Amino acid sequence: MNLSRLFKLGPLPSKNYVDYNLSAIICEDAANVFPVDKYLRETKISAELIGSRDIIKSLFPDIENRKNVKITESISQKDSILKLLETAKTQSDKHTVLSIPTSHLSILAAALPEEYSFTSVSIFTLPESERAVLLTDAFLDYQPTPATLAKLAENAHRIFKLFSDKKPKTAFLSANEKASEKVASTLSAQQAAELSRENMLAEGPLSFDLSLSPASADIKQYKGEIRGDADILVAPRRETASALYFSWKNFANLHPINITFINNTPLFYCDPSDSDISKLLSAEFAITSKVKGPLNKNDTNTQEA
């Protein structure tokens, strides 16, 4: 996948996507209506829209005239998620893409079978360097173990490999780059880095500025391998990731790709506050993505297979 082309906003959608299927949960906040509607109008993708029939018809006024779309009625958010997961299970060998509003993420994470863990990744391109940085966190797990953080990094690594062949530099974030018993997240970051597989260069704990600012690394005379050029950022907690995400999105005006996978099936999610560009980028990335090997599998073995 040519991510640089994608972020430079070539014509989207980029293909007709014949034989592809999009299964999307639609609700009142209309978070993902724009990209779903655009792909339905401009490609030959088939779609299953899950939710209240009345709400779907109000958001897609000509839905009854579209032959490539079916509506699956649901009675609640949880019911919608369960039906989406059933589609992911039965259509896993086909070109299937899933989509949900951000408001359904916590329900999705809670509804996943025990053998899966949940990893959401946001991909940003930094304006000065024009390179991609992946941001991930443990979401509902507010006290992630080092093993959990290492597993998040591995899942993010598999997404990174969709558009890059290089060995990614992974930073386990904390308040500073020195491990201390007084700051628990520094110890977790250190242990997570030690557990990480050899297919990435991992360091932790690492402060945010050392992870992304070469100038800060020079000023602080940091001697590590990651000197402002991290490819993957693993946040210690959900609050940290959320603060970074909204700072980049709202104050730096960046347009994130929001992606996860249910087994091998890509899922993009949208927030009502996301820009139309962000929503299109997320949809195109998901539709054109195909990972090798299971993603999100709850495997605590952190050695290279």
Regions found by a protein language model. Give the residues of each.
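Anion-binding alpha/beta catalytic cores of soluble intermediary-metabolism enzymes, centered on
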Residues: 2-226, 230-305
